[in-house]
């Protein structure tokens, strides 16, 4: 149980650490987004005074600017809460701050599913415990079967016998017999054997359920890891496209060939693409550690 808790703790630490990394990057992104929206707002105000933009245009950009500021404040608050949780996980003071450095993603060479399942069955402590419980029930059945045997003991007797007709002659007599209890039905022992047999069958079924569950879990974890890495590539590509679109929209607006609607739409798309990219990066990291936990290789066991 302690080793299983250690593996869960490692994954929990990784999840919280990746959440901190993601939130820290979100804050940087939100700060840059707010600065761009603030610049757009001031530029739209100037155009409104020149008669090149309507009041509706200015109010719309002002609303987007306020939303960008709200997201920034929300990200900062979430980062503060998550940092306290991370400090407590590490046994540090809740006020501890950390200099965060994103680690490289785990590069796991995926084996064939059957090989991965075999690895998990060889290393998973919960599966080993199920087998240990089954072995204990087998010993329990053997003990119950032995107790069912009648309690028989060998009895010997020796005596010297004098024959009254011949005073000088004595005879040695030996007798051998078997003694046992009178409860031939062995009712209590039979009940104990029946209970031990049921326990053995139940433990055997538990082993089978564990084996099927581990096989299903390993396949799901491998699929999740592959999907997370693929989604990260897609998210990074989409972010690059959204970034290029937002840059172009801002440039066109600045030279008078575009409107602020195009800019704000592009900024919203960039914000969404950035969130997906950061979430995909965190998922790609966490799924790697979860896969190692599922294989039983995340933490070495003594």
What is each stretch, according to the model?
Residues 1-6, 31-32, 56, 60, ...:
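Sec/SRP-type N-terminal targeting helices
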Residues 2, 6-119, 224, 228, ...:
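Periplasmic alpha-helical coiled-coil/stalk elements that build and connect Gram-negative outer-membrane
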Residues 3, 94, 100-135, 197, ...:
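Bacterial Sec-pathway N-terminal export signals of envelope proteins
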Residues 87-93, 136, 143, 289-301:
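Long amphipathic alpha-helical coiled-coil segments
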Residues 100-113, 142, 146, 155-192, ...:
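Small/polar, glycine/serine/threonine/aspartate-rich low-complexity segments that form flexible
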Residues 106, 211, 274-302:
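Acidic, low-complexity, intrinsically disordered peripheral segments
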Residues 245-283:
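C-terminal structured "cap/appendage" subdomains that terminate the fold
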């Amino acid at each position: 149980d302690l080793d299983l808790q250690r593996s869960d703790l490692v994954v929990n630490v990784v999840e919280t650490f990746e959440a901190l990394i993601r939130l820290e990057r979100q804050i940087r992104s939100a700060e840059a987004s707010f600065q761009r929206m603030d610049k757009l707002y001031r530029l739209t105000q100037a155009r409104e005074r020149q008669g090149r933009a309507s009041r509706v245009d200015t109010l719309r950009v002002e609303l987007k600017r306020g939303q960008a500021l709200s997201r920034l404040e929300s990200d900062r608050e979430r980062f503060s809460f998550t940092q306290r949780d991370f400090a407590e996980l590490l046994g540090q003071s809740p006020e501890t701050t950390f200099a965060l450095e994103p680690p490289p993603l785990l590069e796991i060479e995926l084996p064939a599913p059957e090989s991965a399942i075999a690895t998990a069955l060889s290393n998973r402590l919960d599966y080993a415990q199920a087998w240990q419980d089954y072995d204990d029930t087998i010993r329990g059945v053997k003990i119950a079967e032995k107790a069912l045997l009648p309690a028989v003991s060998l009895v010997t007797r020796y005596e010297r016998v004098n024959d009254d007709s011949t005073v000088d002659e004595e005879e040695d007599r030996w007798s051998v017999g078997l003694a046992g209890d009178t409860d031939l039905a062995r009712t209590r022992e039979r009940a104990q054997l029946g209970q031990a047999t049921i326990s053995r069958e139940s433990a055997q079924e538990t082993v089978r359920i564990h084996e099927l569950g581990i096989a299903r879990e390993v396949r799901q974890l491998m699929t999740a890891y592959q999907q997370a890495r693929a989604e990260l590539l897609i998210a990074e590509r989409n972010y690059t496209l959204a970034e290029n679109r937002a840059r172009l929209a801002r440039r066109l607006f600045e030279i008078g060939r575009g409107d602020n609607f195009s800019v704000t739409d592009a900024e919203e798309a960039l914000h969404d693409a950035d969130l997906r990219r950061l979430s995909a990066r965190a998922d790609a990291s966490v799924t790697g550690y979860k896969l190692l936990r599922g294989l039983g290789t995340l933490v070495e066991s003594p």
